[in-house]
């Protein structure tokens, strides 16, 4: 019996893009879904959660989720006690996370609390950013920061296609010591595949906000059959970008849009697959 599994990451509140990915998943008859985090950090956090739930229920698909940065921030306790409360960058993140929380239901937040930090599935390690960051978190913990605030003050580089050779060697060696031969990750919004000595890494890219110069949402299809190894393919889907632009225009209170230039840069990011910083006029 052949089983189709969908893996996706980094929706970033872009419900029109997510709907296009879900339509493609339905066409492929996926019956299991792994979501690797960053669902909520965008203009339609509740809408994206609702779409995922409804699609999986309608298609009788099992859904398993990991926390991304957005979910980690949301679940940070006692945010009013965070260090560096008065620093501008922190004020902005605190207010942005509060906006997400205000636009989620109690049931949404309870569900997010069930998300995993990382997951092992068959011969694979599933993470949001990097298996080293998830399985060796003590390596990046900052001194004088309370344990509950460590994730708030850490933003992984993730796994990028242009990493230096020594970074790749460290990652392959880590996979050897941990006895897994396959990694699925997200975080960088750049979909790609890398193989070395029987080990494979798939970055799922982003299902809502790509950063590889291609605005089409990305996801990964895994086909499992008894007679062959896992068949793994990165897929891209078309969607009407005007729909997310309209949603942005209908959400003027989104905290990041306090700067009108950022709002336009954000739209241009989603239209081009090029980071919003490249579109700012200042």
What are these model-predicted stretches?
Residues 8-9, 33-38, 64-69, 127, ...:
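Active-site neighborhood of phospho(di)ester-bond hydrolases with catalytic His/Asp-centered motifs
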Residues 1-55:
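N-terminal active-site segment of His-dependent metallophosphoesterases
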Residues 110-160:
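Internal, conserved structured core segments that host functional sites
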Residues 54-121, 158-174, 179:
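Active-site neighborhood of divalent metal-dependent phosphoester bond hydrolases
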Residues 182, 194-282:
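Acidic, His/Gly-rich catalytic cores of divalent-metal-dependent hydrolytic chemistry
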Residues 1-6, 119-125, 196-200, 230-231:
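Beta-strand-turn-beta hairpins that frame and shape the catalytic cleft
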